[in-house]
Design a protein with these regions (language model features):
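Glycine-rich phosphate/pyrophosphate-binding loop shared by adenosine-nucleotide-utilizing enzymes
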Residues: 8, 60-65, 96
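Conserved acetyl-CoA-binding loop-helix of GNAT-fold acetyltransferases
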Residues: 103, 109-122
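Conserved beta-strand-loop-alpha-helix junction that forms the acyl-donor binding cleft
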Residues: 105-108, 132-143, 160
Length: 162
């Protein structure tokens, strides 16, 4: 599956892309990343494999990535997901989670993120899933981006205690 948005080409991520994806991840978040996802892309790949992951290319160079998963809601143990299922059980039997997204700094603001999210959302819809992203409340840039993409804040907030 390949999608083009102006000069941005989006395709499924492969194992051969990992080196370039890890370079983007380290460029954005350093070796000790924590923004929304607490571990490196390498670790994500080792746990989840390719999942529903995409890369964006401009002139043959990988300039961004999106990693996600699509899961059946009835298999989820989360009360949040059960609540969502009860409200929309027949319409959305699955959830497509955007787990990680990263765009090289020099290509941010050039529709790369939009192309990646659109590709993931299309795949989610084909699978009968609603698309969801969990982000840190303090990540104003990602929050604005998701709002521009048509995402709406949902009613729950997660609290955590060490």
């Amino acid at each position: 599956m390949v999608r083009n948005t102006s000069s941005v080409k989006v395709r499924r991520m492969t194992h051969d892309d990992l080196n370039e994806v890890n370079q983007i991840d380290r460029q954005l978040f350093g070796e000790n990343r924590v923004p929304t996802w607490p571990f490196s892309f390498d670790t994500y790949w080792n746990i989840y494999g390719p999942g529903v992951s995409f890369v964006a290319e401009i002139n043959g160079q990988i300039v961004g990535f999106l990693a996600g998963t699509i899961v059946s809601q009835e298999r989820s143990q989360s009360v949040i997901d059960m609540m969502h299922s009860a409200q929309r059980a027949s319409r959305y039997p699955k959830i497509g989670y955007i787990d990680m997204i990263g765009i090289s700094k020099q290509f941010q603001g050039k529709d790369v993120g939009r192309a990646l999210v659109n590709a993931f959302h299309e795949e989610s819809k084909r699978s009968g899933a609603i698309t969801r992203a969990h982000i840190k409340e303090s990540d104003e840039t990602l929050s604005r981006f998701l709002s521009k993409m048509g995402f709406k804040k949902w009613e729950t907030v997660t609290y955590e205690k060490d």
